[in-house]
Amino acid sequence: MSSTAQSFREIVGIPRSSASTQDSTLIIIDAQNEYATGALKVENVTETRKSIAKLLERYRQAGNGKNIVHVVHKVPEGAAVFTPNTPLAQEFEELTPNTGEKVVTKNFPSSFAKTDLHTYLQGLGDVGKKVVLVGYMAHVCVSTTTRAAAELGYDVLVVGDAVGDRDIPGVKVETLVSVVLSELADGFATVVSEEDIRA
């Protein structure tokens, strides 16, 4: 049953945002093979990676790649997930970065934690002030990055059909993703669909 409650953002007068490939930066979070074939495989990976690939192609057609950021998670040698020097650590092959696209390596859930992402976005000028987030997992790295971006003053959009997750103890994935997106929409971001991001 859906709620008719007003969001916090509505109550304080923050309007919904929108984005195009010309006025925003696409940030692809942890779209790595771990989430397709590893221990952390997400339930909706086929659908979400298609949405991510569509957005990436749209941004590529619109510019020079500077407003495209690939964030990849790195772990110590021998780790059970994202294992270095194995396919699990690699980004989905259809998302392989082109020349001019930024790659950020992170070690924490937030894409901003101990990385140069904030500095890079500031250097882009206006196009770096609005960020469009996609990737995995909704309740960890996507959520944490969204909140950090909002705290840093970015206009944040999360593409709901381009983020994924898995069942966690006590919560099925459908409920988990729905709650995460509702939380983010309430206080930190505008949640949109892939088709809402205009060329």
Curated annotation (Swiss-Prot):
Keyword Manganese: no
Domain of life: Eukaryota
Chemical reaction(s) catalysed: [(1'E)-5'-(3',3'-dimethyloxiran-2'-yl)-3'-hydroxy-3'-methylpent-1'-en-1'-yl]-quinolinone B = yaequinolone C
Pathway assignment: Secondary metabolite biosynthesis; Alkaloid biosynthesis; Mycotoxin biosynthesis
EC number: 3.-.-.-
Catalytic residues as annotated in Swiss-Prot or TrEMBL: 30, 106, 141
Pfam families (alphabetical): Isochorismatase
Record-annotated membrane-spanning stretches: none
UniProt-listed InterPro entries: Isochorismatase-like_dom (IPR000868), Isochorismatase-like_hydrls (IPR050272), Isochorismatase-like_sf (IPR036380)
Residue runs in coiled coils: none
Biological role stated in the UniProt entry: Epoxide hydrolase; part of the gene cluster that mediates the biosynthesis of penigequinolones, potent insecticidal alkaloids that contain a highly modified 10-carbon prenyl group. The first stage is catalyzed by the nonribosomal peptide synthetase penN that condenses anthranilic acid and O-methyl-L-tyrosine to produce 4'-methoxycyclopeptin. 4'-methoxycyclopeptin is then converted to 4'-methoxydehydrocyclopeptin by the ketoglutarate-dependent dioxygenase penM through dehydrogenation to form a double bond between C-alpha and C-beta of the O-methyltyrosine side chain.
Name the record gives this protein: Epoxide hydrolase penJ
Upper classification of the organism: Eukaryota, Fungi, Dikarya, Ascomycota, Pezizomycotina
Gene name of the record: penJ
